[in-house]
């Protein structure tokens, strides 16, 4: 896991935020926020050394990994404020989760629709969440320069290719894990790497229903990830 974590430090230049090594001065609760995000990602990964599935989406978003440090995972989930949906922080990792955003921004923590849909789908299917690693083709947070850190930007094709070394390190960490592509950007990266993977509809922008159906169909074939 050391090689994987080390590669995350090498984020590209431009309108890209690195949550594990950069501080968001206007929105982070403390100077130690990047270290907290690194610790939370490390805890998440350490509990998934035997994962059998990598669910690969597009890029980190400001409502998810920007503050949690974990792909497709929101602070609101980590803080236990999604229990009414059957989702709790113990699904993510066993330790005590911490917020890194200023409480005044979102008292309950930022929440990301895609994150809630993905974790909800795993919950509904009875999936052992330690068997699934959530990750992104472009592992950092691309934002719109005119709108700042609290915005999302679709990474360009060349940017997405920069995520290949990180993804290869992740695949080496959980060798044998099956990769599922969520959206066109992740499918394109996998194709460039010569990897054939099932392609799922991204749950954003009206795609939640199709994503749930496709995800359920694929995961039910791999029964060992189900409880």
Q: Predicted regions: what is each one?
A:
Residues 1-178, 186-193, 225:
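A polyanion-binding, active-site-adjacent surface
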Residues 194-227:
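Short, flexible loop segments at boundaries between secondary-structure elements
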């Amino acid at each position: 896991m050391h090689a994987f974590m080390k590669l995350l430090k090498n984020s590209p230049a431009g309108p890209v935020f690195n949550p594990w090594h950069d501080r968001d001065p206007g929105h982070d609760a403390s100077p130690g926020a990047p270290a907290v995000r690194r610790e939370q990602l490390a805890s998440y990964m350490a509990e998934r050394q035997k994962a059998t599935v990598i669910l690969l989406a597009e890029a980190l978003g400001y409502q998810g990994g920007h503050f949690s440090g974990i792909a497709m995972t929101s602070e609101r989930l980590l803080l236990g404020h999604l229990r009414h949906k059957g989702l709790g922080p113990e699904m993510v990792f066993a330790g005590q989760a911490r917020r890194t955003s200023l409480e005044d921004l979102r008292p309950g923590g930022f929440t990301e629709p895609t994150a809630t849909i993905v974790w909800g789908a795993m919950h509904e299917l009875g999936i052992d969440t330690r068997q699934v690693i959530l990750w992104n083709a472009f592992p950092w947070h691309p934002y719109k320069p005119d709108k700042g850190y609290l915005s999302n930007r679709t990474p360009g094709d060349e940017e997405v290719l920069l995520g290949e070394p990180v993804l290869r390190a992740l695949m080496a960490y959980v060798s044998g894990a099956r990769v599922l592509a969520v959206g066109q950007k992740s499918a394109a990266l996998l194709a460039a790497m010569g990897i054939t993977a099932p392609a799922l509809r991204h749950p954003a922008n009206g795609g939640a229903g199709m994503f749930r159906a496709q995800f359920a169909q694929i995961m039910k074939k791999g029964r060992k990830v189900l409880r």
